[in-house]
């Protein structure tokens, strides 16, 4: 299975290289590969892709979802051009753009839960509750600092990779899921989302390998991302 996986990765790289070589100098076309976790911040990438589509309609985007370990491994193997991450960045290995958007941590719960009556949720509210958390190592440390407790001392009943699956566990009454806001549409459902207090936010970064030689398509997309990030920062300060 390992040899087969490596062969598929090599074939994918060969196919990408062939497309890049066949691309005209005058017409920018090709594929851009992006790895990302589940986040509303993907809208930022979508806006940049939409903007560049007007100028270069033959650029195609391929988005794969996974946790930070998956994204970084895919970057290191050359399977993706860019990663969207919320963890700290190893600046010895990667270059990055800091995005002017943040994701807000909170709790996904049933509407008939006692905590649903509160506007925000404190660490003490959750100390004795059954919790469903992301199985990413960096997220666990991030949350442990907010909880003011070691995660091992909390009542973690389940971990998840995809928040949609976590929402089903919540809906069935298994526990309270900690996740980013805006990932599950709770409108007209039996679930609701409450932000954490003190407020806990996650900064977003677009990451790529240092000294990366980009295809024309990926290079054009990176330029557009830089423009969008700059404009967004200016608008925020205005």
Description of each model-found segment:
Residues 1-29, 230:
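Alpha-helical "hinge/linker" immediately C-terminal to small N-terminal DNA-binding modules
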Residues 25, 94-105, 109-131:
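Flexible hinge/capping segments at coil-to-helix
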Residues 27, 31-35, 83, 108, ...:
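Short, well-ordered beta-strand segments
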Residues 27-91, 151, 159-162:
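Central regulatory/effector-binding core of bacterial HTH transcription factors
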Residues 44, 193-235:
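A late-sequence structural motif
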Residues 67-80, 85-86, 136-192:
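Hydrophobic hinge/microswitch elements
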Residues 92-98, 102-104, 164-211:
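Beta-alpha-beta core module
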Residues 116, 129-151, 214-223, 229-236:
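Secondary-structure junction motif
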